[in-house]
């Protein structure tokens, strides 16, 4: 049985090094899809590069944890900036859901302005769309706009509440991450998905060249290792040998 594999590189627009890494992993590797940060410092650079790589499917990485929002978000920002304190607000059940709804719509419109088309799918920076308070907002929005949504089903307790017309892959994995990146790890992710009987799988990745912005990230040099693995000819062969077809969320 042929299975669909979506290799999605997060953080398009984070920095020029990140952008170049994603394009390299698409052009000479197995990355088929990316998600863009519309408030990223290098988003205009990402847009420019994407024009020369039409095969790269581009979704939107909804941002609530970094940089400046596009709308006024007094309930979520500090000194006008987003940050990881969103986890504390979620634990306290104090998230400004109306502000988040408006920001989602604004980032979506900004994406269309930048790229000239709808995103192929939605996900979020640091997976905040999987918060139980935020997930229904994003799921409903994706269904209404007719675009797919990354769903990590492990923490999802309200799967029965999904909109009937919401599209997603059957499986999602964030396991290709950390200090032990290798071809063997990537293939283990595929084998685990096959054993679960999933007909389609998204694997998240972060290939990049290291620049000053990436150096400031807690996840820095493994991004280079990811890039090396994702552009390996032997990995591409092993994926095909396992019965996977590379594609994007347009195929689900």
Swiss-Prot record:
Catalytic activity, per the record? N,N'-diacetylchitobiose + H2O = N-acetyl-beta-D-glucosaminyl-(1->4)-D-glucosamine + acetate; diacetylchitobiose-6'-phosphate + H2O = N'-monoacetylchitobiose-6'-phosphate + acetate
Please give the pathway this protein is involved in: Glycan degradation; chitin degradation
Binding annotation for Mg(2+): 125
Name the cofactor(s).
Mg(2+)
Q: Where in the cell is it found?
A: Cytoplasm
Which HAMAP family has this protein been placed in? COD
In Swiss-Prot or TrEMBL terms, this protein is called Chitooligosaccharide deacetylase
